[in-house]
Amino acid sequence: MNTENALLPWGLTRLQQFLSSHNVNPLNQLPHWLNDYFSKNHFSQPRKRADKGHVYLIGAGPGDAELLTIKAHRLIQQADVVMFDWLVNPDIIKMIPRHVERVFVGKKCGRHSMQQADICQLMVEVALTGKNIVRLKGGDPAIFARAAEECDMLAQHQIDFAIVPGITAASGASAYAGIPLTHRECAQSVRFITAHLKSVKSATGELNSSIEEPNWQALVAGANASACSNNRETLVFYMGLKRIDIIMQRLRTHGLPESTPVAVIDQASTAQQKVCIGTVKNIAQQVTEQKFQGPAVTIVGEVVNRRHVVNLSLLSQSVNGVSEKA
């Protein structure tokens, strides 16, 4: 590993290589303002390994690689190790420099490659060797990404860390599907709900997730406000594709009208994005017929009827137009 290159700001490695190949001393030839920016340590002194590395919990966004933030990109370039989930776009993984170690710690419902406790332990072990780690997560690390558990573990071992936000799945799905999450005429607020519930052991030792189910009555009360009111609440379910039939049943059972509009956005903001528009009554059957793969975001509420089909070709030719079924 070239420690000099590892320290250069992103995009300037090639400049340093070019100058070196022409026997040019970059410290003498660069303009004084750029010379000051680099400082001689970038070229003359190898980086000293700290006793403990730092950890950056970074959100990779909802799917489209171009939605990665500039700060996230810079920190990825400067990392010693990048640990990433299965939700991270492969195009973002390609941005990781070759000298940076890549560790896949993906977790997917029903197909765990690593338990959360093992991921936390691995981060600590690597950081204690003095390496700086980027922990790359899909969406935003603070929203249903279990960042709090990782922060707890790092704090226990007195390892410094920082969090870099990413565009959460709900925002990405909303924008790329043309569905507002709030609307001054019909939705004053929005609520994010995880459908991937924590399993709890009963007294007999059996796993039971029903104890951790959301307060359906409260959800329906917010979403089912008076039709002439703008106080209704938009409901957004994360990771609910496999449970969409149960989710719709729960909403109906607690009083949400079957005619309430629902949108399911599959693989939002990627080239594989699909959008299905339906109602509480029929949306589960529709997404089954369309063979959605996930991850998917489900939006419930009047805002779905305020949808506009956006021209995604204005953003990228790699993102397909949406498919609709009313």
Region locations from a protein language model:
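Short N-terminal binding/cap micro-motifs at the start of the first secondary-structure element
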Residues: 64-68, 91, 307
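Alpha-helix N-cap/loop-to-helix initiation residues
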Residues: 65, 112, 143-144, 244, ...
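Class I SAM-dependent methyltransferase SAM-binding "motif I" and its flanking Rossmann-like core
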Residues: 140-231, 274-277
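Short, glycine-rich nucleotide/cofactor-binding loops
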Residues: 57-67, 238
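Short, solvent-exposed amphipathic alpha-helical segments in soluble enzyme
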Residues: 71-75, 97-100, 149-153, 178-179, ...
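Short hydrophobic/aromatic-enriched beta-strand-loop microsegments
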Residues: 100-107, 158-162, 181-191, 255-264
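A contiguous loop/helix-start segment that scaffolds small-molecule binding in enzyme catalytic cores
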Residues: 2-47, 52-55, 131-133, 197-326
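Class I S-adenosyl-L-methionine
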Residues: 1-59, 70-167, 172, 325
